[in-house]
């Protein structure tokens, strides 16, 4: 048994990101309260919290996924009758769902109603949230075949896949899916946003042996159930109520819509959507009323706590259950919202959701890309981390405190699966690709084995190519298609591996309309404390040159982890889907110091930095080379001739380019200035910087990011106070620490480190500009005045000292201009 969190992401009409969560946790009834969520950063706002009373049977929600036995795929490219088969099809009933009365059970797409403090969100009659198990195993499987930690990222618009369907039937089904007015409750609904289904398991213990049918909580009107052999079946609500840990899919039984519609007491919060039953239109309600948290929950200090003494479930528990050490299953429905603020359509939004279930702490990072591809119109979930990080327990031994190790076992973290599902099967050759990762312990070292399963619309012919994006250290163990003998050759480059099919022979005649299953098995040796690039099939080139590039061409997938060689443990794995096109977005914001009233005739020009990238190369043991490139965007096209970059004392600029032309630059007081006479609104700046970090201990270095000053007139210099980094995330192989003075410390582990971050640089800038070296005198004058104000001297003495300093300043200015 395990703790489980089902998380569903979608967007509402007001561009709020909604996280609808179902938490099934095993908590001790002896404790009075438990902390569920950490909302201290105020990025997520609580919309709804509700405890689901599902009866005495409190079995957690389990979705078994099985890994493939190694001996199931023969390594000689031959075929056996006992060959392992994969089931990708659902029952026909899912393709022909019954008619749904929208007025009684469902609300149109992306609509929200709050009923008695409970937010009820339902989807239209679309095949959403069918979490497809892509494996079939024999009944005789031990515990080692279970997959404890796995991630499924699935588009809401994925129709059910039937192996026996023809391509024409798939195409017609897709057309019906995306053009039906009854389905979308209106004219052609634009496929502009998608829902992702993320399942993460937060448990430490392994799952018990395979049981009977395990239900899946589902929002749709038909509850999907995945049995122990990986098949997907349907069960009515009446027949599966006794087995379901929660009736999450039965909206009428949980929320009692008909009874509660007449007892609406709490209004809809600001920015949410109400539904007009008569006109069937969605309208925005701007009623400003706070959400009333139920008595069994409390929001204190940014933490959402669950108070058992106020819950209905706690009241029905017997006194024996309340006092004993055994835990009881609790089920919660939590709905959160956040407002991603994009400065442009190419910006990223990143947020984190923290769960607390002692002794586990689980953090899920969402990195959402706002850009859309050609016809996908798809918001992509770029980064997800579903790893439960154990909080160490402290125990006393021999009079001293010791930390008890609660690290994950090797097979607790992996294998897991990452699935990409395409909803336009008839247009692309690749329907689905799935990667299963599992450890293999050899005599002298450890390695990871990747099993990539691909669903194809057509069989590869002789001369076809399969392009695999993988690390050069990956070794191809086997390529297999059921009932087919393959002869292939490969050519490998640092970026990709090209597999050319020489001869494709069909051993057993099969129906040409069935989808084909291609298996590619690779292995890679583990290296201590490194980041491995996960292999991904990006193209299958044939006569029609179909590809899956809309989803996979722009991404490299990495598995970051630390390998403890002594204990053979895999800790803190993070799945990252990282974009290949090196761009991110941040902007420079000016905050004027209102205390200074000095005027100037040369104001600075507002600008933005677009798509800045920073790459760091280690050229020697204690020297680094930083390559920075970015685009300056201005409000107008006036002539600009000076750009300033302020560097720390241990950094030097070696070369600079402006608009792909070598630029002249000069240094003054640690600030480098570049001259240009261009009148463009967008200028590209590239600089190369040599760095010799300050080594302040044995392992870590200190490096300061360059400060980019606004472009000014050649006669104007701007005095900056400090630079502040907010909402910054740096992804690289190593640990980093921000310091208070704007720098960051990092520990390099590789010769090449890539910094991919989305930051908002806030420059605290004074509202005055000063001529030439007089700025230093003004700065000194202000410092002296500040010192004088802190000393107990008479007013006369302070005035005399200020007068003397003013006379000295005037003489210095006259001397400068006369020379």
Swiss-Prot record:
Disulfide-bond pairs as recorded: none
GO biological process, one term: meiotic cell cycle
Transmembrane segments: 797-817
Cellular component per GO, a single term: membrane
Protein localization: Membrane
Keyword Transmembrane helix in annotation: yes
Name of the protein described by the UniProt record: Meiotically up-regulated gene 45 protein
Organism: Schizosaccharomyces pombe (strain 972 / ATCC 24843) (Fission yeast)
């Amino acid at each position: 048994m395990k703790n489980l969190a089902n998380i569903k992401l979608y967007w509402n009409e007001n561009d709020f990101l909604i996280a609808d969560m179902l938490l099934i946790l095993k908590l001790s009834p002896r404790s009075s309260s438990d902390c569920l969520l950490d909302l201290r950063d105020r990025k997520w706002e609580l919309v709804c919290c509700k405890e689901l009373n599902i009866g005495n049977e409190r079995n957690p929600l389990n979705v078994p996924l099985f890994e493939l036995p190694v001996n199931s795929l023969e390594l000689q490219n031959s075929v056996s009758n006992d060959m392992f088969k994969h089931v990708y099809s659902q029952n026909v009933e899912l393709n022909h769902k019954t008619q749904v009365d929208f007025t009684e059970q469902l609300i149109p797409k992306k609509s929200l109603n709050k009923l008695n403090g409970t937010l009820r969100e339902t989807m239209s009659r679309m095949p959403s949230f069918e979490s497809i198990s892509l494996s079939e195993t024999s009944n005789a499987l031990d515990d080692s075949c279970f997959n404890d930690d796995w991630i499924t990222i699935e588009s809401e618009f994925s129709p059910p896949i039937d192996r026996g369907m023809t391509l024409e039937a798939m195409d017609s089904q897709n057309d019906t899916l995306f053009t039906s007015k009854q389905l979308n409750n209106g004219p052609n609904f634009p496929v502009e946003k998608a829902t992702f289904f993320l399942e993460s398991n937060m448990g430490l213990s392994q799952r018990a042996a395979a049981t009977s049918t395990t239900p899946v909580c589902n929002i749709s009107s038909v509850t999907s159930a995945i049995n122990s052999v990986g098949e997907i079946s349907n069960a009515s609500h009446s027949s599966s109520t006794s087995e379901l840990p929660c009736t999450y899919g039965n909206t009428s039984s949980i929320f009692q819509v008909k009874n509660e519609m007449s007892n609406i007491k709490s209004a809809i919060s600001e920015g949410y959507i109400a539904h007009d039953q008569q006109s069937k239109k969605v309208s925005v309600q701007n009623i400003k009323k706070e959400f009333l948290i139920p008595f069994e929950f409390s929001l204190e200090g940014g933490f959402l706590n669950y108070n058992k003494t106020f819950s209905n479930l706690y009241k029905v528990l017997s006194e024996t259950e309340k006092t004993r050490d055994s835990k009881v299953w609790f089920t919660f429905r939590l709905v959160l919202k956040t407002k991603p603020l994009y400065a442009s359509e190419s910006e990223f939004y990143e947020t984190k959701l923290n769960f607390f279930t002692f002794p586990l702490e689980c953090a899920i990072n969402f990195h959402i890309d706002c850009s859309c591809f050609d016809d996908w119109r798809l918001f992509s979930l770029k980064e997800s981390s579903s790893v439960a990080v154990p909080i160490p327990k402290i125990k006393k031994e021999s009079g001293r405190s010791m930390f008890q190790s609660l690290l994950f076992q090797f097979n607790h973290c992996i294998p897991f699966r990452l699935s990409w599902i395409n909803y336009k099967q008839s247009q692309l050759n690749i329907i689905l690709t799935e990667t299963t990762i599992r450890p293999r312990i050899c005599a002298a070292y450890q390695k990871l084995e990747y099993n990539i399963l691909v669903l194809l619309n057509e069989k590869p012919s002789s001369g076809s190519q399969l392009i695999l994006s993988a690390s050069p250290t990956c070794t191809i163990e086997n390529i297999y298609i059921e009932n087919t003998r393959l002869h292939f050759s490969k050519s490998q480059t640092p970026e990709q591996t090209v597999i050319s099919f020489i001869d494709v022979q069909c051993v057993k005649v099969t129906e040409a309309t069935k989808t084909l299953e291609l298996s590619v098995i690779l292995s890679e040796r583990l290296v201590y404390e490194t980041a491995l690039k996960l292999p991904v099939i990006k193209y299958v080139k044939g006569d029609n040159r179909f590809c899956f590039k809309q989803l996979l061409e722009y991404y490299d997938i990495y598995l970051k982890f630390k390998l403890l060689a002594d204990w053979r443990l895999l800790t803190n794995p993070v799945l990252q889907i990282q974009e290949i096109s090196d761009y991110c977005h941040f902007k420079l914001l000016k905050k004027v110091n209102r205390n200074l009233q000095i005027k100037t005739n040369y104001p600075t020009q507002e600008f933005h930095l677009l798509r800045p990238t920073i790459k760091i190369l280690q050229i020697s043991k204690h020297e680094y080379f930083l390559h920075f490139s970015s685009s300056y965007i201005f409000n107008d096209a006036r002539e600009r001739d000076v750009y300033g970059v302020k560097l720390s004392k241990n950094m030097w600029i070696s070369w600079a380019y402006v608009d792909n032309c070598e630029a002249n630059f000069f240094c003054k007081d640690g600030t480098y200035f570049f001259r240009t006479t261009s009148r463009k609104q967008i200028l590209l700046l590239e600089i190369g910087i040599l760095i010799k970090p300050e080594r302040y201990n044995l392992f870590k270095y200190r490096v300061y990011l360059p400060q980019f000053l606004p472009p000014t007139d050649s006669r104007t210099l701007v005095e900056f106070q400090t630079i502040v980094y907010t909402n910054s995330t740096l992804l690289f192989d190593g640990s980093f620490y921000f310091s208070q003075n704007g720098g960051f410390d990092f520990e390099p582990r590789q010769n090449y480190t890539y910094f991919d971050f989305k930051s908002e640089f806030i420059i605290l800038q004074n509202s005055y500009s000063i001529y030439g070296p007089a700025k230093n005198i003004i700065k000194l004058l202000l410092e002296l005045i500040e010192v004088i104000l802190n000393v107990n001297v008479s007013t006369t003495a302070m005035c005399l000292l200020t007068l003397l300093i003013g006379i000295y300043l005037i003489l210095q200015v006259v001397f400068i201009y006369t020379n």
